[in-house]
């Protein structure tokens, strides 16, 4: 109770600070403070002009924009090429109606819907919906026999926006739901989300700039037993600009999660980042220090928080508009909330908590990370991002395997470890041909528990697409990962999810599409001990009215 009172007092103080900022006679100019605007290059990733509005990328389950890669990745982060189709900006008009729907065998029904009924002057409104699911047989793995189940995910919401001359104000609400059945239990997860955002447009000026993002989720999970969830986040940035290309900025915020029912617990993270931003010529510097504190009821996380972390970025335009070198040195922490874990793996429930290593919900603590990279392009047809780095985790989530009787069960725990990596992203695009992808090499060591499953040494994806006369679009893609294993000897096989896709465009408003997946019929365990069975094909229609 005392812990919750402290959280409420801290949240009230943050809201009061935000209200004070709003009450000043300021130009309504807001922007995310970590955006760097200088004379550095922007490497754009050209794409074939397909037929999905950018707004539909609200359906992405989240990206981690930290310096370090997310150490715990679920099965929903890879999105096949057909699901990534997007139009050029000229395809959007005042009143947009977009629908993409498909079904096939095995049963993978999909639905994307966007309706923009109001775009008058500065005001806009978008209504959207999304559905992804699998219904059918799952493969037999180890001592687990084949079984029939389903995994359904739906999202629907409404967004409102107001575009001032120097600021953007957005707010909205949405529903997010998961229903799944596996060999252990059934689950129904329902969540209602709401957010408010205020962002300035003018970055490099003498004016006071600020940014406020507020989000709240209420969720109810009925899996092993019923649990209520409250997630709240507040992020604010502010600072004084300067025409000389430098300024001092402050980022601050909090994340809080509270649980009742099957689990009585709460946790919160508070952070502040003062940093100095300087740009001159080809050089851009962002020198900051992150101060962050994580607290949990009953001291559930123990002494996991480092409190002070580096937060430094340097960009150097070696060849203006062609080659940029960057260096990031960072660190930080992040709450692994019940909601965020479920969105990465729909099968997770409270039974996943690994005995002796804390509860299912924990905190990722990155002591320090360093990334050196080169981002550039060769002519207007080829762009790339090559980087190498090192990460030292004090605590990070990892898959693990336990047993109940003679049957394996999936689990999740937290461990310190270190990682070195090298990664390459590339895109080659001509008028009718596109080839892009990414590949990462990981070398991890220092994982403490023998039951933890390590990282894949190599993972990535690639896609090749051809557009014939803007009428037929076709290609092949592949998402792949090498095998993983634990020190105790449990092995997760590697895989290559080979797919083909095609689209026939009747006109600007209607097209038909087809996708085939897992053509090599491999055992793909993106979620530990869960693998959908067999080759699959999905066909559908796309309307853009």
Model-derived regions: residue spans:
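Outer-membrane beta-barrel translocator/receptor signature
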Residues: 78-83, 90-99, 103-141, 148-156, ...
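N-terminal periplasmic/intermembrane-space "pro-region" immediately following the signal or transit peptide
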Residues: 22-89
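Flexible loop and strand-edge segments within Gram-negative outer membrane beta-barrel domains
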Residues: 134-159, 169-209, 213-231, 261
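Surface-exposed extracellular loop regions of Gram-negative outer-membrane beta-barrel proteins
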Residues: 119-139, 247-251, 255, 265-297, ...
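Exposed, low-structure sequence patches enriched in small/polar residues
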Residues: 284, 295-309, 313-545
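Solvent-exposed loop/turn segments connecting transmembrane beta-strands
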Residues: 100-112, 121, 148-151, 221-229, ...
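Hydrophobic, lipid-facing positions within transmembrane beta-strands of outer-membrane proteins
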Residues: 95, 109-113, 152-158, 190-196, ...
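Transmembrane beta-barrel strands of outer-membrane/channel proteins
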Residues: 101-103, 127-131, 171-177, 212-218, ...
């Amino acid at each position: 109770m005392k812990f919750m009172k402290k959280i409420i007092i801290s949240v009230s103080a943050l809201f009061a600070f935000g209200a004070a900022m709003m009450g000043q006679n300021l130009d309504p100019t807001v922007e995310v403070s970590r955006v760097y605007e200088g004379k550095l290059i922007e490497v754009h990733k050209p794409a074939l002009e397909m037929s999905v509005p950018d707004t539909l990328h609200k359906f992405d389950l989240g990206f981690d924009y930290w310096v370090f890669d997310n150490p715990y990745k679920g099965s929903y982060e890879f999105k096949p090429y057909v699901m990534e189709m997007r139009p050029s900006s000229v395809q959007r008009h005042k009143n947009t109606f977009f629908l993409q729907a498909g079904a096939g065998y095995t049963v993978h029904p999909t639905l994307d819907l966007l309706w923009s009924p109001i775009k008058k002057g500065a005001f806009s409104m978008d209504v959207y919906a999304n559905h992804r699911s699998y219904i059918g047989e799952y493969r037999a793995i180890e001592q687990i026999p084949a079984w029939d189940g389903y995994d359904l995910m739906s999202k629907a919401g409404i967004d409102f926006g107001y575009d001032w001359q120097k600021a953007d104000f957005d707010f909205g609400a949405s529903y997010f739901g998961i229903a799944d059945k596996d060999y252990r239990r059934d689950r129904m997860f329902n969540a209602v989300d709401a957010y408010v955002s205020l962002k300035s447009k003018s970055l490099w000026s003498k004016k006071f700039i600020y940014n406020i993002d507020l989000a709240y989720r209420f969720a109810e999970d009925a899996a092993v037993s019923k649990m209520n969830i409250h997630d709240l986040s507040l992020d604010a940035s502010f600072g004084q600009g300067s025409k000389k290309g430098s300024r001092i900025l402050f980022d601050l915020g909090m994340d809080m999660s509270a649980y009742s029912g099957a689990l009585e617990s709460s946790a919160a993270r508070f952070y502040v980042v003062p940093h100095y931003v300087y740009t001159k010529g080809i050089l851009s510097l962002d020198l900051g220090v992150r101060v962050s504190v994580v607290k949990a009821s009953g001291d559930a996380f123990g002494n996991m928080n480092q409190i002070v972390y580096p937060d430094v970025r340097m960009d150097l335009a070696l060849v203006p508009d062609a080659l940029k070198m960057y260096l990031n040195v960072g660190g930080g922490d992040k709450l692994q909330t019940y909601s965020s874990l479920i969105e990465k793996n729909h099968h997770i429930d409270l039974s996943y908590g690994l005995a002796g290593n804390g509860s299912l919900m924990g905190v990722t603590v990155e002591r320090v990370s360093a990334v050196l990279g080169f981002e550039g392009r060769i002519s207007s047809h080829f762009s790339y991002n090559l980087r190498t780095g090192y990460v030292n985790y004090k605590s990070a989530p990892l898959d693990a395997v336990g047993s109940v009787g003679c049957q394996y069960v999936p689990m999740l725990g937290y461990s310190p470890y270190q990682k070195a990596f090298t990664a390459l992203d590339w895109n080659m695009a001509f008028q009718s041909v596109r080839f892009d992808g990414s590949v990462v090499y990981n070398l991890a060591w220092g994982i403490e528990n023998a039951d933890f499953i390590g990282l894949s040494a190599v993972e990535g994806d690639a896609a090749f697409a051809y557009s014939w006369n803007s009428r037929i679009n076709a290609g092949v893609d592949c998402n792949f990962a090498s095998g993983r294993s634990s020190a105790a000897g449990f092995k997760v096989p590697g895989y290559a999810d080979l797919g083909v896709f095609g689209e026939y465009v009747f006109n600007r408003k209607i097209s038909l599409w087809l996708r085939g997946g897992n053509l090599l019929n491999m055992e793909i365990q993106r979620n530990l001990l869960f693998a959908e069975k067999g080759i699959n094909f999905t066909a559908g229609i796309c309307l853009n009215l």
